[in-house]
């Protein structure tokens, strides 16, 4: 409310490149990030006339405790009908989060600071390891092409 009265301000939402892509066993995560992206886009349009900027930060691979959520999901799906797929996805995630394959959280803090200081911030900031590359790949490929790319990562190069 005070931002509207001041006719200026910034709202910065932390999403993920996961708000633009999708992976097997990730519906729970990707759905929340897709929703945050859509909500932020709508909010940006609604608040523009009040001088309020809405910014989305889309981190790539960042060193966090995301693995705790993944461990819980593994416990609940490892022996069911999705067990084999889940095991493959665990390997993909383990590879993605090997040392050197992720960025430190400070990268995101720096981007947030940049957006706050900017007089005219971007609507989106992709930051962290692989963020820009993942988003560029998603924009370049058709849905079916992206599906094939993801499944090659999961199943290996011989997958269809």
Give each language-model segment a name.
Residues 1-7:
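A short helix-coil junction within the Rossmann-fold of NAD(P)-dependent oxidoreductases
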Residues 13:
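Rossmann-fold scaffold of SDR-type NAD(P)-dependent oxidoreductases
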Residues 16:
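Residue(s) in the substrate-gating loop at a strand-loop-helix junction
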Residues 21, 42-52:
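Active-site-adjacent segment of SDR/Rossmann-fold oxidoreductases
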Residues 21-28:
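Active-site loop immediately N-terminal to the catalytic Tyr-X3-Lys motif
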Residues 32-35:
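Active-site helix of classical SDR
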Residues 48-99:
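C-terminal beta-strand-loop-alpha-helix "lid" module of Rossmann-like NAD(P)-dependent dehydrogenases
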Residues 54, 93-140:
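Core catalytic loop region at the nicotinamide-binding pocket of NAD(P)H-dependent oxidoreductases
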